């Protein structure tokens, strides 16, 4: 297959430019994550020192030290220069460490950790010996016990040694000022009045953009903008990342009274996920780009998405709940005419050569569509033309490329490919409102989504636009598929009606199962407020035991066969909403708070790029990170033990590396050098540097050279994402199962896969 170059140029020319023009800073930043170096990344060192999964890694500001936290409740400090272990600190945490960082501007003497025991601990390294591999237990200089659930992420502000932010699954983000109290009572304490709550989101989650926030937002991640430190980004148990301006938030409060969630500056969510009401859809990581202009979101059971922070009111990336149905509607582009061609491109050899490359890529993609093989390559070729950094290709070529990519996406059928195809069809219709291909492929996409009426409307228009016998036959075929799909839907509706009648009377409350074990648990009442039934979304449980071997799962999922069959049915939300709103609730004394809350935006920012290839379903700490000071590349861990690197601008896959025996969770790029640290389920940290002899798309880890077929590995990951499991449990339910031991004999043993 034909390959095409990256836009960052020849690395030798960059080095020469640095020597001639002495522009060290800019060139060094471009060199750090140059495409030729990314393609040469290989395992440099496997760093041993932990006895459990390594859940957190972070660099100090100079890049001389790496800190890590693990399930073994230890914090390790590593030397970057020789990859050696300097100190191993017994923290005193009673559960897994999920996050740890160096506190800025403290000469790397203060470190902070957050763990599954709901505590944030601060340690001073000033009295530690620099003797290597010294294992020591030191007392924390500060211990904050005010969270009631696991602390999943910490954030610090560059240049600020006084404040730490912690995000917890209890739905609060707290601000700890190190100049004030050095400790606080635990959340179970009757005198817990620690006023450190910056964001109270225990009623901040929403099922869709149109819904009011009323459920507990179980926080999984947070970040502070590196260029605008007043900007705070959080993500958790729904589809929406939220951007807040710390200057506009209410004063710090205690957790004794629940506050209405404050309005955010922006929501971030791909438009096709904004109306999904699946309780399993949630964010595992959110982060700012190095320049603070973009954010990266990683979803469980989904892909990684890039979005712009600064979108003005007229930006096409902004949308409201009312805009979502328009993406499926024929009238969305009505009245638009074909756009005028752009002005002529200046004639030069380089520009003409680049345009020739683009035309060749479009032709190659068209051949792939016709042949039906190498679909992934065809899509990436279209990505390069549509999203690449180059001269304007002209509306005609762009329209053709959009239609080809839409057709390839519909043929590939990976998760949410159908929504990406719809985006391309709508973009093509903006260029040419009379495009047969755009309307035909839109009809096919809507058919795949089961939106049969809308699909028929587009098929009718495509039939009117057909200019050949072949196109007329295509329309007739898809209309036949629509008729068959409608008949199948009617049949299924009738069967579902009969089945629902036979199930009547089998329901038990899920909260009965969960809270029965809680009554005798140390986590009951005082630790988790009874009001927190929002956490389970008050689902109903259809509880049936089954021992039939016919109900076994896919062998890849490693789930026990038929031991438990759980089906969930939601209650009517209307009763919940009224009880939630009418219940006791704290609020600021000023009456302006109610007015302020009514202005909570229902505007969200849509995606501008999707990164696909990895699998994120097994853990809720999986990161997606920018690589390099300019953030030109994006990386993510995966459940298959690999980690993936994409070019940020186009989404093009650059590298796939085998980094773990099971799962890669954490990826952190060195502040200045071309070096990347990764960790996961293994008890080691891997350091990756560009020392491979030749560039390649794959690289091995500790098991030796990676020889796996790239597209085959990605295909397996996508099947895992798309697998239609009969048993899909809300992860909140699984957390309760994990945290509470049921009385012996109460329930039969069973295993569940985290969704």
Give the predicted meaning of each segment.
Residues 63-67, 86-87, 107-112, 121, ...:
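Structural hallmark of WD40 beta-propellers
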Residues 57-63, 101-108, 155-161, 223-229, ...:
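Loop/turn segments within WD40 beta-propeller blades
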Residues 52-55, 72-76, 95, 116-121, ...:
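Short coil/turn segments within WD40 beta-propeller repeats
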Residues 75-80, 120-126, 132, 154, ...:
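WD40-repeat beta-propellers
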Residues 2-12, 16, 192-212, 217, ...:
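Terminal intrinsically disordered, low-complexity extensions flanking WD-repeat/beta-propeller proteins
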Residues 28-52, 82, 137-139, 267-271, ...:
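A short helix->beta-strand "capping" segment at the edge of beta-propeller domains
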Residues 366-431:
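Alpha-helical adaptor scaffolds
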């Amino acid at each position: 297959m034909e390959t095409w170059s990256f836009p960052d140029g020849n690395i030798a020319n960059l080095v020469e430019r640095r020597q001639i023009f002495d522009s060290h800073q800019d060139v060094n930043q471009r060199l750090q994550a140059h495409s030729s170096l990314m393609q040469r990344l290989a395992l440099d060192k496997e760093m041993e020192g932990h006895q459990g999964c390594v859940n957190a890694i972070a660099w100090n500001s100079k890049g001389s030290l790496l800190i890590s936290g693990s399930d073994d409740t230890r914090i390790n400090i590593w030397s970057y220069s020789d990859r050696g272990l300097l100190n191993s600190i017994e923290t005193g945490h009673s559960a897994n460490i999920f996050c740890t960082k160096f506190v800025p501007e403290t000469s790397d003497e203060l470190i902070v950790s957050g763990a599954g025991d709901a505590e944030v601990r601060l340690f001073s390294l000033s009295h530690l010996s620099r003797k290597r591999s010294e294992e020591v237990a030191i007392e924390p200089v500060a211990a904050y016990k005010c969270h009631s659930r696991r602390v999943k992420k910490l954030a610090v502000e560059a240049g600020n040694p006084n404040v730490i932010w912690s995000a917890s699954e209890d739905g609060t983000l707290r601000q700890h000022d190190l100049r004030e109290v050095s400790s606080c009572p635990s959340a179970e304490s009757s005198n817990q009045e620690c006023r450190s709550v910056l964001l109270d989101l225990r009623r901040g989650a929403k099922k869709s953009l149109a819904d009011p926030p009323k459920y507990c937002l179980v926080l999984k991640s947070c970040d502070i903008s590196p260029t605008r430190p007043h900007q705070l980004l959080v993500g958790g148990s729904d589809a929406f990342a939220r951007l807040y301006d710390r200057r506009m938030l209410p004063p710090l409060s205690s957790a004794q009274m629940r506050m209405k969630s404050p309005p955010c500056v922006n929501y971030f969510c791909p438009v096709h996920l904004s109306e999904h009401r699946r309780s399993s859809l949630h964010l595992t990581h959110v982060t700012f780009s190095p320049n603070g202009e973009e954010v990266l979101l990683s979803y469980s059971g989904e892909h990684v998405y890039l979005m712009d922070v600064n979108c003005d009111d007229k930006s096409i990336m902004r949308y409201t709940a009312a805009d979502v149905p328009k993406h499926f509607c024929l009238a969305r582009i009505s009245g638009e005419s074909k756009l005028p061609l752009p002005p002529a491109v200046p004639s030069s050899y380089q520009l003409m050569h680049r345009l020739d490359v683009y035309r060749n890529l479009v032709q190659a993609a068209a051949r792939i569509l016709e042949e039906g093989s190498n679909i992934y390559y065809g899509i990436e070729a279209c990505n390069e033309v549509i999203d690449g950094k180059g001269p304007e290709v002209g509306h005609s070529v762009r329209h053709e490329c959009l239609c080809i990519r839409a057709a390839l996406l519909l043929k590939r059928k990976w998760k949410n490919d159908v929504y990406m195809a719809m985006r391309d069809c709508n973009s093509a219709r903006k260029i040419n409102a009379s495009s047969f291909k755009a309307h035909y492929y839109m009809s096919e996409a809507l058919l795949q989504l089961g939106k049969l009426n809308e699909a028929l409307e587009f098929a009718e228009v495509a039939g009117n636009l057909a200019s050949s016998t072949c196109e007329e036959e295509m329309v007739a075929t898809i209309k036949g598929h629509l008729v068959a799909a409608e008949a199948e839907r009617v049949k299924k509706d009738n069967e579902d009606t009969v089945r629902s009648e036979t199930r009547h009377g089998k329901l038990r409350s899920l909260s009965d199962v969960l809270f029965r074990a809680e009554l005798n648990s140390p986590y009951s009442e005082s630790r988790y407020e009874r009001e927190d039934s929002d956490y389970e979304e008050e689902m109903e449980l259809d509880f049936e035991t089954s021992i039939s071997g016919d109900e076994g799962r896919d062998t890849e999922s490693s789930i026990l066969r038929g031991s438990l069959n759980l089906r969930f049915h939601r209650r009517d939300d209307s009763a919940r909403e009224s009880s939630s709103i009418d219940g006791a609730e704290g609020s600021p004394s000023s009456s302006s708070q109610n007015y302020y809350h009514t202005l909570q935006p229902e505007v969200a920012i849509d995606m501008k790029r999707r990164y696909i290839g990895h699998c994120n379903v097994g853990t809720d700490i999986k990161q997606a990170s920018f690589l390099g000071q300019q953030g030109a590349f994006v990386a993510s861990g995966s459940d298959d033990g690999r980690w993936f690197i994409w070019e940020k601008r186009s989404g093009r896959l650059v590298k796939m590396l085998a980094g773990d025996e099971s799962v890669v969770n954490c990826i952190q790029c060195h502040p200045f050098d071309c070096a990347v640290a990764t960790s996961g389920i293994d008890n080691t940290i891997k350091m990756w540097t560009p020392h491979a002899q030749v560039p390649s798309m794959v690289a091995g880890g500790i098991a030796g050279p990676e020889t796996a077929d790239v597209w085959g590995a990605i295909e397996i990951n996508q099947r895992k994402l798309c697998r239609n499991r009969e048993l899909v449990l809300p992860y909140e339910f699984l957390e309760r199962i994990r945290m509470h031991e049921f009385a012996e004999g109460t329930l039969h043993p069973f295993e569940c896969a985290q969704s």
